[in-house]
Amino acid sequence: MHLDEPHRHGEPLSRDGSLERLSSTRFDVIVVGGGINGAVSALSLSAHGLKVGLVEADDFASGTSQESSNMIWGGFKYLESYDIRLVAGLCRSRNRLAAAYPTRILETRFMAVLEQGASFAPWFAALGANVYWGLGRLRTIRPRHRSKSTIHRLEPAVATAGIRGGIEYSDYLLADNDSRFVSELVIDAERHGAVVANYVKLESAELGTGVWNLALRDRSTGSTFEASAQVLVNAAGPLVSNVGT
């Protein structure tokens, strides 16, 4: 039986139900890869009303998406190479994400110290931090220059014998961790109507007349089935070249 519509919004499916939907629905988009890029793609597309399938060969967020620093940052380090346009774009993305998930992404203060042999003075680092703050549209607490004595007073655990001073600035951290964040995005995508399943491997994909025909394998049982979509998104990260092989 061919189903024109995925499950209604807010109705989670059992694994068997998800596999049945994957094989019986003509999707607008099927996303391969359940890391951060795949999860965001599935959520964004399903939130815009498209029929979306999401498959992952292992656990969701089992690859590089669970090996991050848990930071949601605006690219402060790239100011060292004066890449203003890149930092401005990263700050915009950071701000949008923080605004969309205020309980999952939290503003956090950081302190960076400069040793005696540093290539630039603390005042110059403070200037850079203020430029970073400005590129971030002043959305965080303002950065501060910190003298050696102030750092010792505020953070007595920091060894200050060989430092010149430092800066204090804000960026964002995930409230839990990266894999939890990705999993929550996958759940959000399902709430918007996406059909999701992990331990489903793409064996092959063939583009026909305006449609992708996919051969999928349920790794828990070894059984294979077919799925179809107008668009195929390969979001497998560093394994992108291995998908379907």
Role assignments for model-derived ranges:
Residues 1-29, 44-48:
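Extreme N-terminal leader/targeting segments of oxidoreductases
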Residues 25-27, 221-231:
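Core beta-strand elements of the Rossmann-like FAD/NAD(P) dinucleotide-binding domain
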Residues 46-67:
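Glycine-rich FAD pyrophosphate-binding loop
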Residues 152-192, 196, 213, 223-227:
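Helix-loop-beta segment of a Rossmann-like dinucleotide-binding subdomain
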Residues 198-212:
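A conserved short coil-to-beta-strand element within the FAD-binding core of flavoproteins
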Residues 234-245:
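Flavin (primarily FAD) binding-site architecture
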